[in-house]
């Protein structure tokens, strides 16, 4: 039973905040603290009035925004969410004075608005609406350079475990005893090898027979999410050279209702596993294979949030769950091991070898409960080892399929920027196919991009369209400086075709002019027509790019122009591409340009000017 007085809320873009929230929930359950665990966007606003202890773990996305599942509900609507409610100006200053709150922010200090998500929540919930902090807000930095782990070199995990330790100590101090069978007794945690059964359990349906001959693949349906749309594939063309190692796709589909979209909007696609990976999983768990095509039901389905985004597959079997819902090719997170290590036991499909069994159980337990995560990182993250491969490695791991919804990660939609013109009846995406070799010398493929490679003309794709409201009226009509290496070009292409800006300057970079100059003909035509001012660079092609290796080099080469646009014409700077060094170097270059040409007295003034640009959305950054 959920306890409305103790609530764990999370807002997560990549899954880190979600996993930490699930770990915290797992630890509290083992101490017999019943509670509610839910995404911020799905938490009913009125429930906060009954809450006494509120634990929030939240990351930051975009221009310092809350993650999508924090500002929208599972149906993609912001209306009626907790955040919309909390932003109401009419709320009294003591609305949350009954709430004791602890907050953890997950961020990356290479972004200008580091941990703004949790800071927004903190400002509103604590400073403006009266909630009491159990302890000061903690902030983690993926780079280990800022926030609560500043200068320590420690990752977000160390900050999370400090957060967890403080919460558990606080709750045990408040409630050292618990009531059991009408009597008070000391609050002692469950032994680690005791598995906590979830509320959502898979059961074989009372309908007899398998599904093999009942519903062919063409009859696969998804129910429970009315916001899902179905597009028809029109193009799936490689737009890099055929002999180039990076396959980039122009992926075009016709929308179901010809929905309107705008520059900066995105589309989420719902991928699926390959039949081969599904079969490999079933072979690694023979007891699953025996019932793989039996019809299933889910207990307490109405309170299962795992299918709210995208709906649940019908017919529901282990095979269809593995194909359409369980992300068996993702890298397992610590919570996976925390919940499954106890299932490593001698069984009929694996001859008993007590020494090996103990080794495997100890290793799985260490991955699940160890606070020094280096071994887990070396085993899973560094070689990009998948859930499927873990199950193949640990032969004694016999997973009960009945509890699969508790420990297997779910396939999440993948988000892509729209690159077609807003007037186009179709949606065009520009997608880099993920394919690489790891330390294990195995070829890795991205789940969604591998799925996209299987799609041909007239195939159906499941999608949702997100209106992100990137641009506001105050900046439209001004000059714009667009910096976009690689597929970061996608939203720029949409923006250029929208004709919303007076003068458009595009700085595009990639590796080789003859291999991956994306949309070269289109960009060259726009340059000839005077639609854009185009500056290119190619990092591995010094013949065609002798004076600029990276986009920041080309910006510096045009420093006088850039300074004039920013300082005299109030130009907008928009950066889009992969995270890491690029956005940091571009920002540093812009600061140096301002220092050189801006007549600022010192570097601090130039930095202050750029921060003011960020505050007023004249400097925008979208990276992934």
Swiss-Prot record:
Belongs to the NADPH-dependent diflavin oxidoreductase NDOR1 family. Its cofactor is FAD; FMN. Its EC number is 1.18.1.-. InterPro entries: CysJ-like_FAD-binding, FAD-bd_FR_type, Flavdoxin-like, Flavodoxin/NO_synth, Flavoprot_Pyr_Nucl_cyt_Rdtase, Flavoprotein-like_sf, FNR_nucleotide-bd, NADPH_Cyt_P450_Rdtase_alpha. It catalyses: 2 oxidized [2Fe-2S]-[protein] + NADPH = 2 reduced [2Fe-2S]-[protein] + NADP(+) + H(+). FMN binds at residues 12-17, 59-62, 106-115, 142. PANTHER family: NADPH-DEPENDENT DIFLAVIN OXIDOREDUCTASE 1 (PTHR19384:SF10), NITRIC OXIDE SYNTHASE-RELATED (PTHR19384). This is NADPH-dependent diflavin oxidoreductase 1.
């Amino acid at each position: 039973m959920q306890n409305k007085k103790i609530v764990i809320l999370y807002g997560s873009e990549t899954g880190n905040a979600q996993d930490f929230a699930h770990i915290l929930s797992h630890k509290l359950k083992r101490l017999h603290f019943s509670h509610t665990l839910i995404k911020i966007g799905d938490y009913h606003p009125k429930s906060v009035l009954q809450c006494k202890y509120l634990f929030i773990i939240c990351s930051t996305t975009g221009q310092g925004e809350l993650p999508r599942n924090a500002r929208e509900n599972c149906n993609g609507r912001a209306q009626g969410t907790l955040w919309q409610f909390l932003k109401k100006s009419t709320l009294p200053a003591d609305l949350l004075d009954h709430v004791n709150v602890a907050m953890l922010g997950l961020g990356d200090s290479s972004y200008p608005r580091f941990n703004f998500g949790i800071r927004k929540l903190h400002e509103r919930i604590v400073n403006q609406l009266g909630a009491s902090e159990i302890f000061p807000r903690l902030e983690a930095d993926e780079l280990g350079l800022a926030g609560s782990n500043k200068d320590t070199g420690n990752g977000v995990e160390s900050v999370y475990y400090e957060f967890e330790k403080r919460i558990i100590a606080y709750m045990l101090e408040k409630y050292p005893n618990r009531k059991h069978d009408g009597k008070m007794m000391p609050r002692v945690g469950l032994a680690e090898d005791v598995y906590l059964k979830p509320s959502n359990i898979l059961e074989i349906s009372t309908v007899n027979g398998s599904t093999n001959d009942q519903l062919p693949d063409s009859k696969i349906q998804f129910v429970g999410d009315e916001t899902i749309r179905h597009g028809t594939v029109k193009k799936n063309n490689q737009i890099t050279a055929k002999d180039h190692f990076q396959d980039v796709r122009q992926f075009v589909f016709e929308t179901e209702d010809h929905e309107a979209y705008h520059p900066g909007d995105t589309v989420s696609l719902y991928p699926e596993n390959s039949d081969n990976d599904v079969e490999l999983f079933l072979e690694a768990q023979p007891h699953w294979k025996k019932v793989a095509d039996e019809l299933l039901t889910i207990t307490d389905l109405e309170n299962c949030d795992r299918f709210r985004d995208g709906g649940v597959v019908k017919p529901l079997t282990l095979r269809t769950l593995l194909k359409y819902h369980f992300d068996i090719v993702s890298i397992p997170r610590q919570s996976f091991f925390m919940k499954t290590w106890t299932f490593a036991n001698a069984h009929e499909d694996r001859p008993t070898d007590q020494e090996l069994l103990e080794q495997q159980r100890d290793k799985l337990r260490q991955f699940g409960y160890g606070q020094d995560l280096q071994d887990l990182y070396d085993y899973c993250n560094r070689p990009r080892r998948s859930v499927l491969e873990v199950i193949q490695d640990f032969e004694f791991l016999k997973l009960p399929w009945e509890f699969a919804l508790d420990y297997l990660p779910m396939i999440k939609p993948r988000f892509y920027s729209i690159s077609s013109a807003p007037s186009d009846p179709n949606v065009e995406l520009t997608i880099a196919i993920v394919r690489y070799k790891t330390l294990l010398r195995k070829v890795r493929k991205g789940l969604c991009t591998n799925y996209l490679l299987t799609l041909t003309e007239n195939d159906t794709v499941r999608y949702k369209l997100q209106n992100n409201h990137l641009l506001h009226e105050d900046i439209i009509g001004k000059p714009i400086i667009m910096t976009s290496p690689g597929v970061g070009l996608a939203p720029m292409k949409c923006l250029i075709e929208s004709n919303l800006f007076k003068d458009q300057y595009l700085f595009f970079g990639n590796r080789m002019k003859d291999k991956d100059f994306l949309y070269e003909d289109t960009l060259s035509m726009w340059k000839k027509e005077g639609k854009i001012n185009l500056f290119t660079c190619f990092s591995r092609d010094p013949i065609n790019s002798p004076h600029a290796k990276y986009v920041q080099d080309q910006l510096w080469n045009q420093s006088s122009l850039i300074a004039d646009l920013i300082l005299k014409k109030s130009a907008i700077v928009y950066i889009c591409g992969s995270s890491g060094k690029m956005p940091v170097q571009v920002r540093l270059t812009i600061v140096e340009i301002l220092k050189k040409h801006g007549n600022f007295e010192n570097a601090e003034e130039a930095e202050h000017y750029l921060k003011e640009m960020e505050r007023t959305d004249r400097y925008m950054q979208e990276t992934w």
